Amino acid sequence: LEWTQAILEAAEAKKAPVLIQTSMGAAKYMGGYKVAKDMITNLVDSMNITVPVAIHLDHGDYEAALECIEVGYTSIMFDGSHLPFEENLKLAKDVVEKAHAKGISVECEVGSIGGEEDGIIGTGELADIEECKQMVATGIDYLACGIGNIHGQYPENWKGLAFDHLQAIAEAVGSDVPLVLHGGSGIPQEQIEKAISMGISKVNVNTEFQLSFAKATREYIEAGKDLEGKGFDPRKLLAPGK
């Protein structure tokens, strides 16, 4: 709730369209995809948000993708990157067909993203160029591709984004296909800006929010604010993180 409010407030203040995404784990924690979707749409209404707001499923399996299509998400990521490529391709085609029938956009991934996301650990790899071309041919609306990026915090010995590989992917799939950069937290700003100039159109950020939220909440408690008056009220306890 607090994150959604903060994101919507920031988007409205900047007059910038925003995409709010839920992972499978986050949606389960919140009570399901319909609960998450309804909360966002109701907040958009009650907060008088005027900028476009997309509701996106992040790293969803086949079943999650179909459920989000049914409950009204406006954008779906089907992630079959852990499956044999032919199976990934087959399921992606089916998700695209079902989603496009309802005007919903689809993101798919080639080359697993490194790090951990909701308990799922990706080894991290550079996306295969030919597989990227085949995935785009399914009719997906945007493509997530491994270019050295990872989920979570980046290690000190991280070598940076593989820009040569990003350029090769962009040239292979064409300029009409937006590319997606997962693991945006921790990537230096200049690398993000360079990636955008080379075809990246969607940058996912999560860990950065989690760390900021945790830091502000911890400082509130360590300062003893939760012991002052009704400072223990979750609305006050979580406000600094928001």
Where are these regions (language model features)?
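C-terminal alpha-helical cap/extension of soluble enzyme domains
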Residues: 188-242
